[in-house]
């Protein structure tokens, strides 16, 4: 019963985080400080391999490392795309690309991890 209530509350309160927005050095810290936030680090020259997932129960932001190399260095981004899931400003999960610069984690995998973070709040 408890799980059913949690699932229903997640469905009712879920927000789809598509229409991703770009963040920069100036607003990065304030944006990731909010609840569950997904940040995709990518490069404009590799836009074809960008994930840009439409996920629920999170905010989704993009960082172009060719413009914000300080963020690339701070978060040790060595390959792109790299997707980091933050919870209240703290890195929780990191998804890395394969040798073809494509993200191995699909949308379903990333969403599952976000859902687990959400459910953990109720335990």
Where are the predicted features?
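Non-catalytic, surface beta->alpha helical segment in thiol-disulfide oxidoreductase systems
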Residues: 85-123
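Structural micro-motif
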Residues: 75-87
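N-terminal post-signal-peptidase region of extra-cytosolic proteins
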Residues: 65-70
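Local sequence-structure signature of Cys/Sec-based thiol-disulfide redox active-site neighborhoods
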Residues: 21-57
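Sec/Tat signal peptide C-region and signal peptidase I cleavage site
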Residues: 15-19
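Short amphipathic alpha-helix with an adjacent loop that forms part of the alpha/beta core around
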Residues: 30, 74-75
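Sec-dependent N-terminal signal peptides
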Residues: 4-13
């Amino acid at each position: 019963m408890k799980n059913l209530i949690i699932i229903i509350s997640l469905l009712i309160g879920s927000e789809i985080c598509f229409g991703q927005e770009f963040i920069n050095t100036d607003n990065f810290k304030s944006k990731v400080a909010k609840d569950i936030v997904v940040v995709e680090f990518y490069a404009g020259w590799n836009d074809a391999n960008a994930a840009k997932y439409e996920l629920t129960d999170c905010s989704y932001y993009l960082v172009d490392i060719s413009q914000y190399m300080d963020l690339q260095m701070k978060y040790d981004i060595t390959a792109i795309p790299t997707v980091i899931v933050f919870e209240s400003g703290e890195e929780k999960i990191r998804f890395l690309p394969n040798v073809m610069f494509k993200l191995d984690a699909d949308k379903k995998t990333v969403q599952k991890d976000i859902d687990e973070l959400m459910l953990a709040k109720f335990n």
